[in-house]
């Protein structure tokens, strides 16, 4: 409820989340990765289908959700896919049963289309990481990839998703996959690739060293303190997300 991945990247000045197909291919070839969104040439029918779903009240239709998610993935030519399916009060999948149904549908249809697919259910009953808000989340990601700060839950989920993809592609063990992840984080290669990708897609060229200057900082800050001792038992994550939307 705080926006998607592309909304986060839109907070990076100049970053283009919707490049043309040739630019997308070039960035992937030169850098090795590109975080982008749907373009008019990639699964063009999906946008029209979604608008129809909205009008006829089938936004929550499982088959249509499945086709919407997978159409873009399959059209981009993937050979392997790992999906992070959220479940909890901050997700559209409010219960584990709903999330399982969606996961099973996604995996079944993907495999039917010849795409190796795995879905991992992850908890969204609390904020992932220590930040909430587009720019703040990008800042935390930069600190993570620079190995300056890692939230335990964020690291665990990130490693699980990446390791599953590495196991699927390279046919290696989980332990070997974890070692590969730790190596590229510790030697700075992951950070270097991130910086190259941001620059190639129109963002700042030295974002790792100048991110505090390049990313927009708010002029208004307010600390909110707890007025009594105790443990946090539950977080209404959806309400927190809606508050952020109201704040802009």
Where are these regions (language model features)?
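Phosphate/diphosphate-binding glycine-rich loops and adjacent basic-rich segments that engage nucleotide
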Residues: 29-76
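A glycine-rich phosphate/pyrophosphate-binding beta-strand-loop-alpha-helix module
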Residues: 1-25, 29, 36-38, 97
